[in-house]
Structure formats: C-alpha cells, structure tokens
C-alpha cells in the first residue's frame, strides 16, 4: 500500500512539474511577445519622431533656399512673369504682386527682413524638438490673432451695412448675430491660451481683445465709432504681442546660451571633425536635405502637370525639367546629391534583399550611394550647372543622371555577381532564390539597352555619351558572362566529381568578357580622338581621354595579360604533375582538401605528396603558387616528370614525408629550396630583385602565409586582384576558429 501511495505521489509531482513547466513556457512566450511588441513600437516611435522632426524643420531650409535664390532682387523687380516661373505659381499671383508692390519696402526694411528670415530659419534648424514644437505653437497663436482680426473686421462691416444707429437687443434673433461672433472670438481665445500655455490671469484677460467691437456695439456704441473700437483692439493686440515677447526674451536668451554651451561641450569631447559629425546626425541634415528637395520637386511637378496642363506623354522631359528648376543653389545641389545617394542605396539594399545577400555594406563607400552622389556634385561643379538656364540644365542633367545610372548598374552587377556565383555551392538555397537572382541578372542585361536608347533620343553623341554606352555594353556582357558561369557551375554541382572541362569554359567566358571590355574601351578612345580632330582640342576632353586610356585600357590590358599568363602557367604546371590511378585513390579513400568531394577516378599529386582534384588544383594555382594544405611554395623545378614513379613508390615517399612533416611542423621552412629559383610565370617585374632582397622577401611571405592558415579558400571565390586587395583579417579569423574547434 505504501508503494502504491509513493507511486501516486511521484506521479502527482511529475504532473505538477509538467504543469509548472508549461506555465513557465507560456509566461516566457508571452514575455518574448511583449518584448517584440515593445521593440516594434519603439521603432515606430523613433521613425515617427524622425519624420515629425524633419517635417517641422523643413521651413527653415526652404526660407534659406528662397532667400539665396532671390538675394540679388529688390521688391520692385519682382514681376508677374517671374512669379509664374516659381514653384508657387498656383497661388493668386496678381494679389501677391499687388501686396508686395503696395508695401513700398525701402532698402533698410529689406535688409532687416532678410536678417529676420535668417534668424527664424536658424531657429527652425537648430532648436530641439520640444522647443521647436513650442515655436510652432507661437506661430499658430499669431495666425489665430489674424483670424480674430478678420472676424472683427467682418463684424464691423456687417454692422455698418445694417444702418441701425442704435442697437436694440429686444429679441433673440437680434442677439443671435452678436452672440455667434462673440462665441467665435472666445473659442479662438481658448485655443490661444492652450497653445501659449499662459498661466496668469492678466494674460488671459488680454487675449480676447478683438471682442472689444462686439462688446462696444452691444453696449450702445454709435456706428461711426465702431471702427475706432476695432482699431483699439488692433492696438491692444500689438501691445500684447510686444509685452509677451519682452517677457519671454530672457528665457530665449537663456536657452540660446545653454545650446551654445552644449555645442561647445560636444566639440570639446569629440573634437572638431567628430563634433561636426555628431551635430550633423543630431540635426538630421541628410534627411532634411532629402525631404526639402523632394518637397520642392513635387511642387514643380504639380505646377507642370496641373497648372500648365502638360500631358503624361511628356513625363520624361517633365521630370528632367522639374529637377533642373529645383536645383538652383548650392543647397539644392547638395540636396539633389543626397537624394541620389539615398535612392541608389535603397535600390542596392532592395537588390540584396531580393537576392538574399547581406545588407551590410562592408565599406562606407561600398554600394551605399556615396559614389553616385559625389559624381553628381563633381560633374555639376565642373560644368557650371548652377549658372545655366533651365534648357541647358535639362540637357546637362540628363547626361549626369545617365552617368549615375551607369554607376548604379555597375554596383548592382557587383552585388549579383557574388551572390549568383555562390548559389550553386549552397545546398540550402531555394529555387525561388535562384529564380530571383537570375531575374536580377537578366534585368542587368536588358536595362542598359533601354537606357542607351532613351539617352540617344534625348542627347547628342559626344565623348560622355560614348563612355556611358561603352559602360552599358560592358555591364550587359558581364551579366551574360555571370549567367553562363552560373549555368556551368550548376552543371558541375550535379556531377559526382569535378568536371575536367569546366575550368576551360569559365576561362573562355572570362576571356570573352575581358575582350569585350577592351574593345569597348578602344572604340571610345577612337571616337574621342575623332572628336578632338573634328571639334577641336579642349582640356576637359583631353583629361577624360587620358584618364580613359590609363584606367580603362592600360590597366585592363595589364590585368588581362596577367590573368592569361597565370592561367596558362597553372595549366602547364598541372599537366606536369603526376596523376594518381584508380587503385591509389581507392586505397586512400580520401577527399579533396579544396572542394571536400571524394576522389574516385582522378587526382593530381603535388611535389609535397598531397592529393587534389586536377580542376580544383588548377584553379588554386592560377591564383597562388603554393600547396593548399601545407602552403609550400611550388617552384618551376618542382613541376617535372621525375617526380612521378610507380604507385607503390609514391605511397612510400608520401608516407615518409608526411611523417616527417608531422614530426617537425613548426619548421617547414627547413625544407631544401633552390637559392636561385626562377620567378613564377605571370609575376611582374619586382624592384626587390634589383637590390637582392627577393629571397628574404619570399621567405617572409611564406612564413606569414603558413601562419595565416593552410585552409584559405578565398582563391576559389575571387580573382587575383580581389584576393590581393583583400585584407588578411578574414583568413586569420578562419584559422582561429579551426584551432578552437580542434
């Protein structure tokens, strides 16, 4: 009986524990859900605050832009045609001109007004968000004073039209008009008191000053004296505003001093450069420039499409005209560059999101839009864009935007190339991801044709358009080459062992791409020389041609020759290595250390007696003349037929030397090496040879390579230039992780 009770007790405890565990799991799930909701709400709050702050600061930059644009004009010079050409042409232009011309501003008043606009703009741009909202509440209060003034003037006019010298409120109908006007004034007073947050009785009593004509009329004020009551109300309002400003001035001065101290503290803590960067981020200058330019651009589009009645068939020219009319000062030029940067960055991020690549840019200038923004600024400054007329701006801007599109297509190709070439070796990649990447690559094939077609329809053919067309053709050829290499790699992944001819196909595709690049560059050079002969010599054209010859022809030709030499040397060397037969491979039952696929039918034996697939080793040796496992430098003397002998002898030598390497792994440099080894094929002239430092430098490089790790897989993924430009940090991290795992 006691045993049964113990079993029942144990069962109850287990049930209780399960119940508690389920409860704890439920609580943990609820806690995680609440945390995720809090994180989402925080992000939404931050985004809302950013949008609100940027929108509230927008008038400051607009005021400075308009002041800069019309700083050379006087008020009398403003004409009806000039106002109709502005983005505000959908307002009542005659009324605005009549208002401006009747003010009779003199020069001193214009200067005071200009400095006041600058002061207000700086307040919009620099005040904290809480103070900025407070500032808007004051402006809204002034607007409500204007509404109260208008209602008071309407009331006086209505009373003058009635013709009643003496007011008799002997009925509810007669009281109705006066009561509604008085109620409207009280509602405005309540709103003003809420906005100004007045906390004293005298201030509240002074607010309903425009109700004075209503009270005076209801108290029996003669009709001819009613305008005097309205004038008294206006005078009282002005006195109230002046008194309020004097009362709030010490607080404004104190806030200004506090802000200056905070700015000084930022520069003292962070230094000059970092301090400017901190203030730049705090004031959200980039977002503000983008928002300002987009706002002005949309206003211009509204004028062109709605006010001027242009059709949607002219949308291309309308867009270019809108950008040209919007960009008139250095401020809007910077805003245009920042907007271009954001658009290019968003397109690059969207491409990475679609293809499943990482969204980290790696470097601050990599696919972040800064290159396109700097290109816009440099080209506009070089050509004097801001001083041109709208028609000239439109043509030049079309050229600049096509250059930006060409640079953007090149950035997108760099993104899709890495992703598409890594997809065949990724077993977890879904078919949808493969399809998305192929679609992006096909778009890079088609889009350059459309950009070239539209550019030729808008712009004449010159050296700039020739360079853009050549870049478009290069991007198309590269995209086609990447698609072909992707197909070849897919075929290779379906085979049991690496395909012997796959490296040849990849090599021919790369050679074809490089040939097309060189051909396009030479065509541009010939066209540029013809332009110089036909049109005449200019320093800008000569500088462009010189840069084009150095970068696009000489450097590409040098890289192509080096690529072909390295590949031919790798093929020559791999053919001189001995082959392992099927019996040896079955006895070893080993995998290739490069591709990690079992070696069944074909393998090559290095001079240090390591086995690899022939295609894998050829790819490796085309980049680095070292053994992938032990990083022993392989010289020309090592690739001879004498190293091959019978299978048994190879096995014995391989086992003996493998044991020797295991016994003395710390001193691999003690292996015999020819003192006067010839330079590996494909190496360029080295100035160290002139001073006899080559042997010492090679020893140092081999030691560093052994330290950085023997399982460096980068040569299989990137070309020679990319490998040499890459830092060794990635390989060091890989070695550290493998040592920790071992």
Curated annotation (Swiss-Prot):
Annotated region described as Disordered, given as residue ranges: 642-684, 722-742
Protein localization: Membrane; Golgi apparatus, cis-Golgi network; Golgi apparatus, trans-Golgi network
Biological-process GO terms, alphabetical: ERAD pathway; proteasome-mediated ubiquitin-dependent protein catabolic process
ATP-binding keyword on record: no
Membrane topology label: Multi-pass membrane protein
GO (cellular component) term, any one: endomembrane system
EC number(s) recorded for this UniProt protein: 2.3.2.27
Zn finger intervals (RING-type): 592-630
Biased composition range(s): Acidic residues: 659-672
Uppermost EC category: transferase
CDD domains (UniProt xref): RING-H2_RNF139-like
PROSITE patterns: ZF_RING_2
Catalytic reactions on record: S-ubiquitinyl-[E2 ubiquitin-conjugating enzyme]-L-cysteine + [acceptor protein]-L-lysine = [E2 ubiquitin-conjugating enzyme]-L-cysteine + N(6)-ubiquitinyl-[acceptor protein]-L-lysine
Chief place of localization: membrane
InterPro entries, per database record: HRD1_E3_ubiq-ligases, TRC8_N_dom, Znf_RING, Znf_RING-CH, Znf_RING/FYVE/PHD
Transmembrane segments: 109-129, 138-158, 178-198, 233-253, 285-305, 318-338, 368-388, 395-415, 438-458, 463-483, 533-553
SUPFAM superfamilies: RING/U-box
Record keywords, A-Z: Golgi apparatus, Membrane, Metal-binding, Transferase, Transmembrane, Transmembrane helix, Zinc, Zinc-finger
A GO molecular-function descriptor: ubiquitin protein ligase activity
Keyword Thylakoid: no
Function (record text): E3 ubiquitin ligase that catalyzes the direct transfer of ubiquitin from E2 ubiquitin-conjugating enzyme to a specific substrate. Acting downstream of probable Golgi transport protein eas-1, involved in inhibition of activation of transcription factor sbp-1, thereby playing a role in regulating AMsh glial cell size.
Family annotation (PANTHER family): RING FINGER PROTEIN 145 HOMOLOG (PTHR22763:SF191), RING ZINC FINGER PROTEIN (PTHR22763)
Listed name of the protein: RING finger protein 145 homolog
Species: Caenorhabditis elegans
Organism taxonomic ancestry: Eukaryota, Metazoa, Ecdysozoa, Nematoda, Chromadorea
């Amino acid at each position: 009986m006691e045993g049964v009770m113990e079993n029942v007790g144990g069962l109850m405890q287990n049930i209780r524990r399960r119940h508690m565990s389920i409860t704890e799991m439920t609580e943990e799930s609820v806690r995680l859900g609440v945390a995720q909701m809090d994180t989402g709400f925080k992000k939404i709050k931050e985004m809302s605050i950013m949008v609100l702050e940027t929108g509230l600061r927008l008038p400051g930059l607009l005021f400075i832009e308009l002041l800069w644009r019309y700083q050379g004009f006087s008020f009398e010079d403003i004409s009806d045609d000039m106002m109709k050409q502005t983005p505000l042409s959908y307002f009542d232009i005659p009324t605005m001109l009549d208002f401006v011309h009747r003010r009779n501003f003199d020069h001193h008043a214009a200067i005071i007004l200009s400095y006041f606009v600058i002061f207000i703009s700086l307040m919009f741009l620099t005040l904290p968000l809480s103070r900025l909202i407070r500032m808007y509440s004051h402006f809204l209060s002034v607007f409500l004073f204007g509404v109260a003034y208008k209602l008071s003037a309407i009331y006086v006019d209505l009373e003058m039209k009635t013709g009643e010298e003496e007011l008799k409120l002997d009925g509810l109908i007669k009281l109705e008009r006066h009561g509604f006007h008085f109620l409207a004034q009280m509602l405005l007073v309540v709103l003003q008191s809420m906005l100004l947050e007045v906390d004293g009785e005298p201030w509240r009593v002074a607010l309903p000053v425009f109700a004075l004509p209503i009270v005076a009329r209801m108290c029996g004020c003669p009709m001819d004296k009613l305008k005097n009551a309205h004038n008294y109300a206006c005078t009282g309002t002005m006195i109230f505003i002046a008194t309020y400003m004097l009362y709030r001035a010490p607080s404004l001065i104190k806030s200004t001093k506090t802000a200056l101290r905070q700015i000084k503290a930022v520069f003292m803590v962070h230094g000059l450069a970092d301090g400017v960067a901190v203030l730049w981020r705090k004031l959200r200058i980039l977002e503000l420039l983008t928002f300002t330019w987009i706002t002005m651009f949309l206003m211009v589009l509204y004028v062109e499409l709605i006010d001027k009645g242009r059709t949607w068939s002219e949308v291309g020219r309308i867009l270019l005209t809108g950008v040209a009319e919007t960009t008139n000062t250095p401020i809007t030029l910077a805003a245009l560059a920042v907007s271009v940067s954001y658009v290019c960055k968003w397109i690059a991020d969207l491409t990475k999101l679609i293809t499943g690549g990482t969204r980290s840019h790696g470097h601050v200038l990599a696919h972040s839009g800064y290159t396109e923004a700097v290109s816009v600024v440099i080209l506009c400054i070089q050509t004097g864009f801001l001083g041109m007329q709208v028609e000239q701006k439109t043509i030049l801007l079309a050229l600049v935007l096509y250059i930006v599109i060409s640079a953007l297509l090149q950035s997108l190709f760099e993104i899709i190339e890495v992703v598409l070439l890594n997809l065949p070796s990724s077993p977890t990649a879904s078919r949808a991801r493969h399809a998305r990447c192929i679609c992006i690559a096909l778009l890079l094939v088609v889009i350059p044709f459309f950009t070239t077609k539209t550019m030729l329809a808008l712009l004449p053919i010159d050296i700039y358009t020739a360079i853009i067309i050549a870049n478009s053709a290069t991007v198309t050829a590269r995209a086609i080459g990447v698609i072909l290499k992707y197909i070849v790699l897919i075929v290779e992944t379906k085979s049991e062992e690496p395909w012997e001819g796959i490296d040849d196909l990849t090599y021919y595709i790369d050679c074809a791409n490089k040939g097309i690049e060189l051909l396009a560059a030479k065509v541009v050079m010939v066209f540029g020389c013809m332009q110089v002969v036909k049109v005449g010599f200019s320093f800008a054209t000569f500088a462009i041609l010189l840069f084009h010859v150095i970068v696009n022809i000489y450097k590409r030709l040098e890289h192509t020759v080096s690529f072909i030499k390295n590949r031919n040397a790798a093929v020559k060397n791999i053919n001189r290595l001995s082959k392992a037969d099927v019996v040896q491979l079955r006895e070893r039952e080993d995998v290739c250390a490069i591709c990690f696929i079992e070696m069944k039918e074909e393998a090559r034996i290095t001079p240090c007696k390591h086995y690899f697939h022939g295609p894998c080793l050829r790819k490796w040796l085309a980049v680095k003349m070292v053994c992938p496992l032990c990083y022993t430098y392989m010289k020309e003397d090592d690739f001879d037929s004498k190293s091959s002998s019978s299978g048994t002898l190879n096995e014995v030598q391989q086992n003996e030397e493998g044991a020797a390497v295991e016994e003395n792994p710390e001193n691999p440099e003690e292996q015999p090496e020819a003192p006067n080894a010839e330079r590996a094929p494909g190496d360029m002239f080295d100035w160290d040879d002139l001073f006899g430092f080559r042997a010492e430098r090679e020893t140092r490089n081999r030691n560093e390579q052994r330290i950085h790790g023997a399982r460096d897989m980068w040569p299989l993924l990137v070309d020679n230039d990319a490998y040499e430009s890459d830092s060794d940090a990635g390989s060091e991290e890989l070695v550290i992780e493998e040592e920790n795992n071992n």
